[in-house]
Amino acid sequence: MARTVQCVLLKKEADGLDFSPYPGELGKRIYEQVSKEAWQQWLKHQTMLVNENRLNLADARARQYLARQMERYFFGEGADQPTGYVPPTA
């Protein structure tokens, strides 16, 4: 039986992650409160942030920026959108 969580982002009960995707306290919070579906949404957003902002993940500042964005995405006021980004219409 799959582990379920009350997803903080989707505001519903959903399948939980199989393991903590990030170290430390933030990783523990994500494991306990974020669903697989929400994590996949974050990965897409993270990829967009890396590409549009031309982040070099070998740079510690870029990794710190992404960690802050991840925390804001799930537990804060939401992550940054790249400059000029217009969400697609359905």
Swiss-Prot record:
Annotated signal sequence is: none
Tell me one GO biological process term.
Answer: cellular response to oxidative stress
GO molecular function of the protein, one example?
Answer: iron ion binding
Give a GO cellular-component term: cytosol
Q: Which Gene3D superfamilies match?
A: Fe(II) trafficking protein YggX (1.10.3880.10)
Pfam families assigned to the protein according to its UniProt record, in alphabetical order: Iron_traffic
SS bonds (residue pairs): none
Q: Which InterPro entries match?
A: Fe_traffick_prot_YggX, Fe_traffick_prot_YggX_sf
Give the top-rank taxon of the lineage listed in the UniProt record for this protein.
Bacteria
Keywords (A to Z) from UniProt: Iron
Homology family: Belongs to the Fe(2+)-trafficking protein family.
What role does this protein play?
Could be a mediator in iron transactions between iron acquisition and iron-requiring processes, such as synthesis and/or repair of Fe-S clusters in biosynthetic enzymes.
What name appears for this protein in its UniProt entry? Probable Fe(2+)-trafficking protein
| Source organism of this protein record | Leptothrix cholodnii (strain ATCC 51168 / LMG 8142 / SP-6) (Leptothrix discophora (strain SP-6))
